[in-house]
């Protein structure tokens, strides 16, 4: 029994000294989804998205339950596909961004893919998500390559966002969503999105990222 605190302490030290290795090991334990699970979870997320898009109103008890189910389903889909994010991120190492930054950018793309995935179209989620993940990473790399000098205050805020993202990744065992980052920083999600937008050029934000819909943008 006396060895348990030691094991916890050693685990904490490994997590602090090598967060990337710890994170990769953590997501590797998350089970993959079956095609049937993708459809079920995807439908639950879409129900949640439709309800949230209806605006600020009082939800019924059933709707509140559907929102909770949808949120859990979204988290499950994201955690089950983080290995895909890491796989894509490794292909873009050495192109201007650190691996952790690539994973963070790819996780934002994954989040958008989960929110927009329509199971009724018949394609695999990983195929759909890959495009969003890659798009998010390549845009971030393109922005970095322009070597735009950001204002000091903006640079500091972006550094804080990265720090909070890593801390949440340690806590959750997954890269956090924008909502989770905003809540941890005690700022509205609109403010977080505004900071992320400012770090990109207007051209990179105004380019459509979904040819089928024709009106989805990175900053959406």
Describe these PLM feature segments.
Residues 145-159, 196-220:
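Conserved alpha/beta core segments of nucleic-acid transaction machinery
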Residues 1-8:
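His/Asp/Glu-rich acidic catalytic environments and adjacent acidic regulatory segments
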């Amino acid at each position: 029994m006396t060895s348990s605190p030691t094991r916890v302490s050693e685990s904490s030290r490994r997590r602090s000294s090598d967060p990337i290795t710890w994170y990769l090991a953590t997501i590797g334990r998350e089970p993959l989804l079956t095609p049937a699970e993708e459809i079920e979870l995807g439908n639950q997320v879409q129900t949640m998205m439709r309800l949230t898009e209806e605006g600020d109103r009082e939800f019924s008890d059933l709707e509140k339950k559907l929102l909770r189910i949808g949120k859990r389903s979204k988290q499950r889909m994201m955690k089950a596909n983080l290995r895909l994010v890491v796989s894509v991120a490794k292909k873009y190492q050495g192109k201007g961004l650190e691996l952790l930054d690539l994973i963070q950018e790819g996780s934002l793309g994954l989040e958008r893919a989960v929110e927009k995935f329509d199971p009724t179209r018949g394609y695999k989620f990983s195929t759909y998500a890959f495009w969003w993940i890659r798009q998010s990473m390549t845009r971030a790399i393109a922005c970095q390559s322009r070597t735009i000098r950001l204002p000091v205050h903006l640079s500091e805020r972006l550094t804080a966002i990265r720090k909070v993202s890593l801390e949440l990744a340690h806590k959750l065992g997954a890269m956090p969503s924008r909502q989770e980052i905003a809540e941890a920083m005690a700022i509205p999600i609109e403010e977080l999105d505004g900071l992320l937008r400012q770090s990109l050029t207007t051209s990179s934000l105004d380019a459509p990222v979904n040819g089928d819909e024709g009106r989805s943008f990175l900053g959406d």
